[in-house]
Amino acid sequence: MTTLLNPYFGEFGGMYVPQILMPALRQLEEAFVSAQKDPEFQAQFNDLLKNYAGRPTALTKCQNITAGTNTTLYLKREDLLHGGAHKTNQVLGQALLAKRMGKTEIIAETGAGQHGVASALASALLGLKCRIYMGAKDVERQSPNVFRMRLMGAEVIPVHSGSATLKDACNEALRDWSGSYETAHYMLGTAAGPHPYPTIVREFQRMIGEETKAQILEREGRLPDAVIACVGGGSNAIGMFADFINETNVGLIGVEPGGHGIETGEHGAPLKHGRVGIYFGMKAPMMQTEDGQIEESYSISAGLDFPSVGPQHAYLNSTGRADYVSITDDEALEAFKTLCLHEGIIPALESSHALAHALKMMRENPEKEQLLVVNLSGRGDKDIFTVHDILKARGEI
């Protein structure tokens, strides 16, 4: 099928979906391309970002955790966005696209529940019906977000197949869309999946990096040495990276979930520890068994518990433009506690992975003068019960 935009990032990406979904993807691409050129659409999107979601978000300089080092550390505060995470940015854009295409329903998948909450709020705001697929395990560990979705009128459908987590929710959402695309828009929650989703999600998240660039220049008079973001599917990271890709002096660091440790096999780090394959409509690195079956990923944070990664991250990794590292559950938990105790900010466990790597960079080289920005992609209200149970089991509380 000919496309208006390039469906690949190097060898990664593409449109590996059943033939029945090709017209829906073509319609979506056409709507997106025309919307990008439509000043009225852009004005409506920007108005929602400013007056509903609360953009621009703050860039906060850490006051205490850098003590004794020469690091200056800023946090891009996506946790302050309405809905509690960066997810709100792109769902507002996709919901407007759905209306533009004449759709009346939204289908979504969610892991941590943040994309589900964002999909529910955008649907409520714009008068769209919303059904959300969520792994049964995630329904259990993210009950506050499940209730938020239901409060805003969304139907939450627990998925019991497979590992009962995000990858299974993705499969069910795609299955639903195959039979309902004439009236429903599939609101994919990350910068992954079949073309044109990785491009759409990047463009509807790129204000994160654009704002960061303007804010850091105003505050410090120069660009950062590195921007750091956690990577599950990769939307918050690509939103932060997009405006810095051509700034070759700025390091781009993506942080995958190391789970219980890479050597245990219980992690979610396919970029560095997976093999390229076809999954979820795209060609990308993924965690798979010797015979090509998708392996279960694992992370303390439901939002990073995904066995593959967006194709643009795969490309940035293959060209060496971005570096990808991993952080274990324990390291993320320590960073979570550190930010709570010393800066009075409760971060999402997802974002705590990025913070943990920044703290590691700082502590490994305390003499080095460096200017770092961490994308604090979401707030940790949804994670307090998980953290409470772990700390209680350890006898720390």
From Swiss-Prot:
GO terms for molecular function: tryptophan synthase activity. Its EC number is 4.2.1.20. CDD domains: Trp-synth_B. The keyword Lyase applies. It catalyses: (1S,2R)-1-C-(indol-3-yl)glycerol 3-phosphate + L-serine = D-glyceraldehyde 3-phosphate + L-tryptophan + H2O. GO terms for cellular component: cytoplasm. Transmembrane segments: none annotated. Pathway: Amino-acid biosynthesis; L-tryptophan biosynthesis; L-tryptophan from chorismate: step 5/5. Keywords: Amino-acid biosynthesis, Aromatic amino acid biosynthesis, Lyase, Pyridoxal phosphate, Tryptophan biosynthesis. The modification N6-(pyridoxal phosphate)lysine is found at residue 87. Its cofactor is pyridoxal 5'-phosphate. Pfam families: PALP. Belongs to the TrpB family. The beta subunit is responsible for the synthesis of L-tryptophan from indole and L-serine. Tetramer of two alpha and two beta chains. PANTHER family: TRYPTOPHAN SYNTHASE, TRYPTOPHAN SYNTHASE-RELATED. This is Tryptophan synthase beta chain. It comes from Escherichia coli O157:H7. The gene is trpB.
